[in-house]
A protein has these predicted regions:
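Alpha-helical scaffold segments that flank or form the walls of functional sites
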Residues: 78-127, 131-153, 184-198
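Metal-coordinating catalytic core of metallo-dependent amide/deamination hydrolases
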Residues: 133-274
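Active-site-adjacent C-terminal substructures of enzyme catalytic domains
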Residues: 264-299
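Divalent metal-coordination and catalytic microenvironments
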Residues: 9, 27, 32, 56, ...
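N-terminal metal-binding scaffold of metallo-dependent hydrolase/deaminase domains
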Residues: 1-46, 58
């Protein structure tokens, strides 16, 4: 088992219940676990160990990224979609995303993981929901390959889109899948990659993309499968007024009511964005998680 010993950490920021900041401490890491924190940990206790002198350094827990789209790192700076509201922005970019393949997803993940690690983020999720008809269904497998190679803790969410333009949704039909195909691949990924143990480096959650790109049936089926398998649920919610208008027009209810109706409220659910909730909805969401994305929503 690999071991790492950080010696003489000037400031160890614990983020524990007391928010303690410890001075001049050592940290011993064995494998993927911090096994000891203390003063003057001796090398003869640890055997063959890599030692780093942390004098003058600050050490703190790695940041955790709770919402991301790694493949989008490959599509930055496209002039046609700059400064657009969400719906036309998506419609413009779908014309590029419909050509996604395994290579693009792998390298997009490597770029994104590198940027995250460089800025102190050691755990990240990703919400990948674009599966073009021309690509294989193993795009998320490529993300796990990249995460293992670079060494980041990765929680993949198996995103999905089942409501294309022909069914009144936003995405083109070339990037949507059938409900059966989505659920079969979701179960395959859970069985192949999900590790429920403490300190796991790989986990899987289920993440239908949004109320305007999936069917009500898929939301319910995904929730049932996730709870059967013991994994979490994630989706975009209340990100724009266009989404609210879509939900009222198609379902006759606001986004939060739709989530309640499909079994998507609870401690095993976290939503992305969530900026158009009223006071009553905030009370009903108590216990569910929200990933706030200010750099996106303040554009």
């Amino acid at each position: 088992m690999s071991k790492l010993l950080l010696k003489n950490v000037d400031y160890l920021v614990t983020f524990n219940d007391k928010d303690e900041i410890l001075r001049n401490y050592d940290i011993l890491v064995e494998g993927n676990k911090i096994t000891k924190i203390g003063k003057d940990i001796q090398t003869d206790e640890t055997g063959d160990t890599e030692i780093i002198d942390a004098t003058g350094k600050v050490v703190l827990p790695g940041f955790v990224n709770t919402h991301h789209h790694l493949y989008q790192t490959m599509f930055r700076g496209i002039d046609e979609v700059q400064e657009m509201p969400l719906f036309p922005w998506l419609e413009g970019l779908y014309e590029f995303w419909k050509y996604l393949n395994e290579e693009t997803v792998y390298y997009g993940s490597m770029v994104g993981f590198s940027e995250l690690l460089k800025t102190g983020c050691t755990t990240t999720m990703d919400h990948h929901y674009v599966f073009p008809n021309t690509s294989k269904s193993t795009l998320i497998d490529e993300q796990f390959r990249a995460s293992e190679e670079i060494g980041i803790r990765f929680h993949a969410t198996r995103g999905s889109m089942s409501r294309g333009k022909e069914q009144g949704g936003l995405p083109p039909d070339s990037v949507v899948q059938s409900e059966e195909e989505i659920l079969l691949d979701s179960e395959r990924l859970i069985d192949k990659f999900h590790d429920s143990e403490d300190y796991a480096m790989k986990r899987v959650a289920l993440a239908p993309c949004s109320p305007f790109s999936v069917t009500k049936s898929l939301m319910k089926s995904s929730a049932e499968l996730a709870r059967k398998k013991g994994v979490m649920l994630h989706t975009h919610l209340a990100e724009t007024m266009d989404e609210e208008e879509f939900c009222i027009s198609v379902y006759g209810m606001r986004p939060v009511e739709l989530m309640e109706d499909t079994g998507w409220i609870g401690p095993d659910v976290w939503f992305a964005h969530g900026i158009y909730f009223n006071d009553d909805e905030l009370k009903r969401l108590k216990g569910s998680g929200i990933a706030h994305c200010p750099s996106s929503n303040m554009k």
